[in-house]
């Protein structure tokens, strides 16, 4: 588990998300409390439940990005789900327990990758020997010293990269599609479907076939196979289950859409309340059956988010409200924040587009007045049409750089400066025609 202090967590989040200090501080404390909990006596540790969070704010202000970056920072299994995708038990659709099953799948994949990295050196050594066997098959006529000498020469050529494009015949698993199990897509039967597929996989193991491929591709497959052999799959599952139960994060987006606020009909209120009641035991802490065994949700951190334009957290059922004790409102973004988003983050849009076009030999630079003009346009369009927050910058940048992106292969070595005049030239028609801005931006 990460030992970063709340201040260090906020500092790391600042590299990717502009503003929203209150939200950053709240999630940083929530993560630090997990570290603190692990240092308690076992008898008290189980009593300390995570303080789940509701983030309120319009779209495009950083709700999802804060949660996603937090999970990466802490190495925690993370999944983003949408509350509207689930239905209450008895109706066609996914049941809420499937989010825990999906989180467990992500946890297993995360641990498998970590363990594969740990044994990669051994896997590469074994894969290299198998690769040389493909290049130099065993022959009774070969002398021991002659064969070893040839093998060493091939090893040297391979390590120098001279054999990457040579083709070999290699036996690989045949990827066969299993029978469609649509019957198990019914509510409450997903777990049974997973168990049935596992049973079918054991009863009918995958067939192998010979395939011609380049040596570099064969090398990658052999490394994966050897790493898989070196891994203790039971250990991987045990570690993953522990990681999911103790550090897992489930981000539930659009929670406001299942709240019974103003303008909702009685029939939809009933359906929405059903989803909330199904969510309740998962958030409170229960045991969910997965293909990897039982997973407890008592200490999984739930971060919910929503715009809450037509409803408010108090419209949720009281029991669910009580399970989200922490609430924070994220600020809407204006031109100052848009300017900072274009310049400050480690993965700023301007850096992304400049790097993409640099692959074609085209150098793109942005002046300060050009960036401020983009920010002003984004704020203006958001005010006059739908406010989609920072996502507006994507559409603005695409329109501004559309011509150069199309012509880049024919203009290597060229330098393009995006200043205020360049921005106005490419966006002025949209500003003049307000109806056009609704469709283009």
Swiss-Prot record:
<dbReference type="Pfam" id="PF07724">
    <property type="entry name" value="AAA_2"/>
</dbReference>
<dbReference type="GO" id="GO:0036402">
    <property type="term" value="F:proteasome-activating activity"/>
</dbReference>
<dbReference type="Pfam" id="PF00004">
    <property type="entry name" value="AAA"/>
</dbReference>
<keyword id="KW-0346">Stress response</keyword>
<feature type="binding site">
    <location>
        <position position="319"/>
    </location>
    <ligand>
        <name>ATP</name>
    </ligand>
</feature>
<dbReference type="InterPro" id="IPR003959">
    <property type="entry name" value="ATPase_AAA_core"/>
</dbReference>
<dbReference type="InterPro" id="IPR004491">
    <property type="entry name" value="HslU"/>
</dbReference>
<dbReference type="GO" id="GO:0005524">
    <property type="term" value="F:ATP binding"/>
</dbReference>
<keyword id="KW-0067">ATP-binding</keyword>
<dbReference type="GO" id="GO:0009376">
    <property type="term" value="C:HslUV protease complex"/>
</dbReference>
<dbReference type="GO" id="GO:0008233">
    <property type="term" value="F:peptidase activity"/>
</dbReference>
<dbReference type="GO" id="GO:0043335">
    <property type="term" value="P:protein unfolding"/>
</dbReference>
<protein>
    <recommendedName>
        <fullName>ATP-dependent protease ATPase subunit HslU</fullName>
    </recommendedName>
</protein>
<keyword id="KW-0547">Nucleotide-binding</keyword>
<dbReference type="InterPro" id="IPR019489">
    <property type="entry name" value="Clp_ATPase_C"/>
</dbReference>
<dbReference type="InterPro" id="IPR050052">
    <property type="entry name" value="ATP-dep_Clp_protease_ClpX"/>
</dbReference>
<comment type="subunit">
    <text>A double ring-shaped homohexamer of HslV is capped on each side by a ring-shaped HslU homohexamer. The assembly of the HslU/HslV complex is dependent on binding of ATP.</text>
</comment>
<feature type="binding site">
    <location>
        <position position="253"/>
    </location>
    <ligand>
        <name>ATP</name>
    </ligand>
</feature>
<dbReference type="InterPro" id="IPR003593">
    <property type="entry name" value="AAA+_ATPase"/>
</dbReference>
<feature type="binding site">
    <location>
        <begin position="60"/>
        <end position="65"/>
    </location>
    <ligand>
        <name>ATP</name>
    </ligand>
</feature>
<comment type="similarity">
    <text>Belongs to the ClpX chaperone family. HslU subfamily.</text>
</comment>
<dbReference type="GO" id="GO:0051603">
    <property type="term" value="P:proteolysis involved in protein catabolic process"/>
</dbReference>
<dbReference type="GO" id="GO:0016887">
    <property type="term" value="F:ATP hydrolysis activity"/>
</dbReference>
<keyword id="KW-0963">Cytoplasm</keyword>
<feature type="binding site">
    <location>
        <position position="18"/>
    </location>
    <ligand>
        <name>ATP</name>
    </ligand>
</feature>
<keyword id="KW-0143">Chaperone</keyword>
<comment type="function">
    <text>ATPase subunit of a proteasome-like degradation complex; this subunit has chaperone activity. The binding of ATP and its subsequent hydrolysis by HslU are essential for unfolding of protein substrates subsequently hydrolyzed by HslV. HslU recognizes the N-terminal part of its protein substrates and unfolds these before they are guided to HslV for hydrolysis.</text>
</comment>
<feature type="binding site">
    <location>
        <position position="391"/>
    </location>
    <ligand>
        <name>ATP</name>
    </ligand>
</feature>
<dbReference type="InterPro" id="IPR027417">
    <property type="entry name" value="P-loop_NTPase"/>
</dbReference>
